[in-house]
């Protein structure tokens, strides 16, 4: 129906970006990155279900499954660089707050941020 605005039945919001000039030591520290992701889930009002991490060369990948979707961090310490993706379903969550918490904890001097509304109308 044209002109009718309906409320999405599924609220999906994704915040993702690239972080530059990050703290090199944090980017290498698996345990610290896991702690950051756990706290980001709390800050974003998400329910952490599981977290896995892998050391890949000097870098680290952390993948957290939250009840509402996921949080990921991938790091490249040799470039002081990381990528972050926070995707959540549910109006009660705040992926932007979770993303910004990670930006601050990695001490990024600059970053890009992208936001996508992935809500659906059935």
Swiss-Prot record:
Q: What the entry says about post-translational processing?
A: Is synthesized initially as an inactive proenzyme. Formation of the active enzyme involves a self-maturation process in which the active site pyruvoyl group is generated from an internal serine residue via an autocatalytic post-translational modification. Two non-identical subunits are generated from the proenzyme in this reaction, and the pyruvate is formed at the N-terminus of the alpha chain, which is derived from the carboxyl end of the proenzyme.
Q: Which cofactor does it need?
A: pyruvate
Keywords (A to Z) from UniProt: Autocatalytic cleavage, Decarboxylase, Lyase, Polyamine biosynthesis, Pyruvate, S-adenosyl-L-methionine, Schiff base, Spermidine biosynthesis, Zymogen
Q: Identify the SUPFAM superfamilies for this entry.
A: S-adenosylmethionine decarboxylase (SSF56276)
Annotated positions for site Cleavage (non-hydrolytic): 68-69
* Positions of post-translational Pyruvic acid (Ser) modification: 69
Q: Which GO terms describe its molecular function?
A: adenosylmethionine decarboxylase activity
The note on cofactor binding and number reads:
Binds 1 pyruvoyl group covalently per subunit.
Superkingdom assignment:
Archaea
Catalysed reactions, as listed in the record: S-adenosyl-L-methionine + H(+) = S-adenosyl 3-(methylsulfanyl)propylamine + CO2
Q: What is its EC number?
A: 4.1.1.50
What broad class of enzyme is this? lyase
Q: What are the BP-aspect GO terms?
A: spermidine biosynthetic process
- State whether it acts alone or in a complex, and with which partners, per the record: Heterotetramer of two alpha and two beta chains arranged as a dimer of alpha/beta heterodimers.
HAMAP family, A to Z: AdoMetDC_1
Q: Which family does it belong to?
A: Belongs to the prokaryotic AdoMetDC family. Type 1 subfamily.
Cite the PANTHER family for this sequence. S-ADENOSYLMETHIONINE DECARBOXYLASE PROENZYME
- Main role? Catalyzes the decarboxylation of S-adenosylmethionine to S-adenosylmethioninamine (dcAdoMet), the propylamine donor required for the synthesis of the polyamines spermine and spermidine from the diamine putrescine.
This protein is called: S-adenosylmethionine decarboxylase proenzyme
Species for this entry: Sulfurisphaera tokodaii (strain DSM 16993 / JCM 10545 / NBRC 100140 / 7) (Sulfolobus tokodaii)
